[in-house]
Amino acid sequence: MSDFVKTMTIRALALVKSFSKSQKRLALKSYSDQDRTIWFYTPTNHGGLSFADMSSTQHRLVLSLVSSGLSTSGFNTVAAIMGLDNILDNLEDFKVNFKRERGRDPLLYYITIFGDPGSEKEWGWRLGGHHISLHYSIKGLKVLSFTPSFFGADPADSPLLGPHLHRPLASLEDLGRELFTSLSGTNLQSALISAIPPVD
Protein backbone atom coordinates (compact mmCIF):
# COMPACT_ATOMS: atom_id res chain seq x y z
CA MET A 1 0.00 0.00 0.00
CA SER A 2 1.40 3.41 -0.91
CA ASP A 3 2.38 5.66 1.97
CA PHE A 4 -0.20 8.21 0.78
CA VAL A 5 -3.13 5.78 0.90
CA LYS A 6 -1.85 4.07 4.04
CA THR A 7 -1.69 7.36 5.94
CA MET A 8 -5.14 8.39 4.72
CA THR A 9 -6.61 5.02 5.74
CA ILE A 10 -5.03 5.08 9.21
CA ARG A 11 -6.31 8.60 9.83
CA ALA A 12 -9.80 7.77 8.56
CA LEU A 13 -9.95 4.74 10.85
CA ALA A 14 -8.84 6.83 13.83
CA LEU A 15 -11.58 9.34 13.09
CA VAL A 16 -14.25 6.65 12.75
CA LYS A 17 -13.09 5.04 16.01
CA SER A 18 -13.62 8.36 17.80
CA PHE A 19 -17.29 8.65 16.81
CA SER A 20 -20.10 8.03 19.26
CA LYS A 21 -23.15 6.06 18.13
CA SER A 22 -25.08 9.24 17.39
CA GLN A 23 -22.14 10.71 15.47
CA LYS A 24 -21.82 7.54 13.40
CA ARG A 25 -25.42 7.88 12.28
CA LEU A 26 -24.55 11.26 10.76
CA ALA A 27 -21.01 10.63 9.53
CA LEU A 28 -21.05 7.10 8.12
CA LYS A 29 -22.76 6.10 4.88
CA SER A 30 -22.41 3.31 2.37
CA TYR A 31 -20.17 3.88 -0.62
CA SER A 32 -23.16 3.40 -2.91
CA ASP A 33 -25.14 6.17 -1.20
CA GLN A 34 -26.21 8.74 -3.80
CA ASP A 35 -25.16 11.50 -1.42
CA ARG A 36 -21.55 10.64 -2.28
CA THR A 37 -21.94 12.14 -5.77
CA ILE A 38 -23.48 15.43 -4.61
CA TRP A 39 -21.35 18.51 -4.10
CA PHE A 40 -21.84 22.22 -3.61
CA TYR A 41 -20.03 25.08 -1.88
CA THR A 42 -22.74 27.19 -0.27
CA PRO A 43 -22.86 27.92 3.51
CA THR A 44 -25.55 25.28 4.07
CA ASN A 45 -25.85 21.78 5.51
CA HIS A 46 -23.62 19.53 3.41
CA GLY A 47 -24.71 16.34 5.12
CA GLY A 48 -22.52 14.34 7.44
CA LEU A 49 -21.16 15.36 10.83
CA SER A 50 -20.37 19.03 11.40
CA PHE A 51 -17.45 20.46 13.36
CA ALA A 52 -20.13 21.98 15.62
CA ASP A 53 -21.11 18.45 16.69
CA MET A 54 -17.56 17.24 17.31
CA SER A 55 -15.00 17.66 20.07
CA SER A 56 -11.77 19.59 19.61
CA THR A 57 -9.92 16.27 19.46
CA GLN A 58 -12.18 15.19 16.61
CA HIS A 59 -11.59 18.50 14.82
CA ARG A 60 -7.90 17.63 14.85
CA LEU A 61 -8.61 14.12 13.54
CA VAL A 62 -10.65 15.53 10.64
CA LEU A 63 -7.96 18.06 9.78
CA SER A 64 -5.35 15.30 9.96
CA LEU A 65 -7.37 13.29 7.44
CA VAL A 66 -7.72 16.33 5.20
CA SER A 67 -3.98 16.99 5.32
CA SER A 68 -3.26 13.41 4.21
CA GLY A 69 -4.86 14.18 0.86
CA LEU A 70 -3.30 17.58 0.21
CA SER A 71 0.08 19.24 -0.17
CA THR A 72 1.19 21.60 2.58
CA SER A 73 0.10 24.57 0.48
CA GLY A 74 -3.21 22.87 -0.29
CA PHE A 75 -3.92 22.23 3.39
CA ASN A 76 -2.92 25.77 4.34
CA THR A 77 -5.33 27.11 1.72
CA VAL A 78 -8.19 24.98 3.04
CA ALA A 79 -7.47 26.10 6.62
CA ALA A 80 -7.39 29.75 5.54
CA ILE A 81 -10.68 29.44 3.64
CA MET A 82 -12.38 27.78 6.61
CA GLY A 83 -11.47 30.80 8.74
CA LEU A 84 -12.90 33.34 6.32
CA ASP A 85 -16.42 33.08 7.74
CA ASN A 86 -15.22 35.07 10.77
CA ILE A 87 -13.97 37.82 8.46
CA LEU A 88 -17.14 37.70 6.37
CA ASP A 89 -19.28 37.86 9.51
CA ASN A 90 -17.49 41.06 10.49
CA LEU A 91 -17.94 42.55 7.01
CA GLU A 92 -21.68 41.88 7.29
CA ASP A 93 -21.78 43.50 10.75
CA PHE A 94 -22.54 40.12 12.39
CA LYS A 95 -26.16 40.29 11.22
CA VAL A 96 -26.57 37.43 8.71
CA ASN A 97 -28.26 34.45 10.35
CA PHE A 98 -29.81 32.24 7.60
CA LYS A 99 -32.46 31.22 10.17
CA ARG A 100 -29.90 29.54 12.42
CA GLU A 101 -27.97 30.57 15.54
CA ARG A 102 -25.05 31.96 13.53
CA GLY A 103 -25.19 32.55 9.78
CA ARG A 104 -21.47 32.75 9.09
CA ASP A 105 -20.18 29.86 11.15
CA PRO A 106 -16.68 28.38 10.71
CA LEU A 107 -17.90 25.26 12.53
CA LEU A 108 -20.32 24.38 9.74
CA TYR A 109 -17.97 22.14 7.80
CA TYR A 110 -19.10 18.56 7.44
CA ILE A 111 -17.23 15.26 7.20
CA THR A 112 -18.73 12.08 5.75
CA ILE A 113 -17.08 8.67 5.44
CA PHE A 114 -18.47 6.42 2.71
CA GLY A 115 -17.89 2.68 3.04
CA ASP A 116 -15.32 1.03 5.30
CA PRO A 117 -11.81 2.54 5.37
CA GLY A 118 -9.17 -0.12 4.87
CA SER A 119 -11.48 -2.69 3.30
CA GLU A 120 -10.80 -4.23 -0.11
CA LYS A 121 -13.93 -2.57 -1.44
CA GLU A 122 -14.30 1.07 -2.46
CA TRP A 123 -14.51 3.64 0.29
CA GLY A 124 -14.17 7.38 0.42
CA TRP A 125 -14.65 10.58 2.34
CA ARG A 126 -15.91 14.09 1.80
CA LEU A 127 -15.35 17.42 3.50
CA GLY A 128 -17.85 20.12 2.58
CA GLY A 129 -18.75 23.59 3.73
CA HIS A 130 -18.66 27.22 2.68
CA HIS A 131 -16.36 27.41 -0.35
CA ILE A 132 -14.75 24.02 0.31
CA SER A 133 -15.68 20.69 -1.27
CA LEU A 134 -13.19 17.81 -1.16
CA HIS A 135 -13.93 14.23 -2.28
CA TYR A 136 -11.72 11.14 -2.23
CA SER A 137 -12.58 7.66 -3.50
CA ILE A 138 -10.22 4.79 -2.71
CA LYS A 139 -9.95 1.11 -3.53
CA GLY A 140 -7.22 -1.20 -2.36
CA LEU A 141 -3.86 0.38 -3.06
CA LYS A 142 -4.88 3.50 -4.89
CA VAL A 143 -7.00 6.61 -4.96
CA LEU A 144 -9.67 6.20 -7.64
CA SER A 145 -10.60 9.86 -7.67
CA PHE A 146 -10.02 13.11 -5.81
CA THR A 147 -12.68 15.04 -7.69
CA PRO A 148 -14.78 17.04 -7.55
CA SER A 149 -12.69 19.48 -5.58
CA PHE A 150 -13.62 23.11 -5.04
CA PHE A 151 -11.77 25.95 -3.35
CA GLY A 152 -13.40 29.38 -3.12
CA ALA A 153 -12.85 32.47 -1.02
CA ASP A 154 -15.28 35.03 0.37
CA PRO A 155 -14.01 37.64 0.82
CA ALA A 156 -11.45 37.13 -1.94
CA ASP A 157 -9.16 39.60 -0.20
CA SER A 158 -9.12 41.29 3.18
CA PRO A 159 -6.67 43.77 4.72
CA LEU A 160 -4.11 42.72 7.30
CA LEU A 161 -1.92 44.88 9.51
CA GLY A 162 0.62 46.77 7.45
CA PRO A 163 0.42 47.02 3.66
CA HIS A 164 -0.75 43.43 3.21
CA LEU A 165 -3.81 41.65 1.85
CA HIS A 166 -5.02 38.21 2.90
CA ARG A 167 -5.75 36.45 -0.43
CA PRO A 168 -5.99 32.66 0.00
CA LEU A 169 -6.41 32.07 -3.75
CA ALA A 170 -4.20 34.90 -5.01
CA SER A 171 -2.00 32.92 -7.39
CA LEU A 172 -4.93 31.00 -8.89
CA GLU A 173 -7.03 34.13 -9.34
CA ASP A 174 -4.14 36.02 -10.92
CA LEU A 175 -3.31 33.14 -13.26
CA GLY A 176 -6.95 32.87 -14.34
CA ARG A 177 -7.15 36.57 -15.09
CA GLU A 178 -3.85 36.46 -16.97
CA LEU A 179 -5.10 33.57 -19.09
CA PHE A 180 -8.42 35.27 -19.81
CA THR A 181 -6.88 38.59 -20.80
CA SER A 182 -4.50 36.76 -23.16
CA LEU A 183 -7.44 35.49 -25.23
CA SER A 184 -8.93 37.26 -28.21
CA GLY A 185 -11.32 36.70 -31.10
CA THR A 186 -13.01 33.31 -31.29
CA ASN A 187 -10.96 31.99 -28.34
CA LEU A 188 -12.38 34.71 -26.12
CA GLN A 189 -15.91 34.07 -27.39
CA SER A 190 -15.54 30.36 -26.65
CA ALA A 191 -14.15 30.97 -23.17
CA LEU A 192 -16.70 33.58 -22.08
CA ILE A 193 -19.79 31.73 -20.88
CA SER A 194 -21.56 34.88 -19.69
CA ALA A 195 -20.66 38.53 -19.31
CA ILE A 196 -22.64 38.52 -16.05
CA PRO A 197 -21.00 36.53 -13.23
CA PRO A 198 -23.11 34.20 -11.05
CA VAL A 199 -24.47 35.61 -7.79
CA ASP A 200 -22.08 33.43 -5.77
Where do the PLM segments sit?
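Short, mixed-charge, low-aromatic patches
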Residues: 16-21, 131-133
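N-terminal module-boundary/linker segments of secreted carbohydrate-active enzymes
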Residues: 1-18
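N-terminal regions that are enriched for targeting/export leaders
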Residues: 18-30
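Acidic/His-rich structured neighborhood in mature extracellular/periplasmic domains
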Residues: 2, 34-200
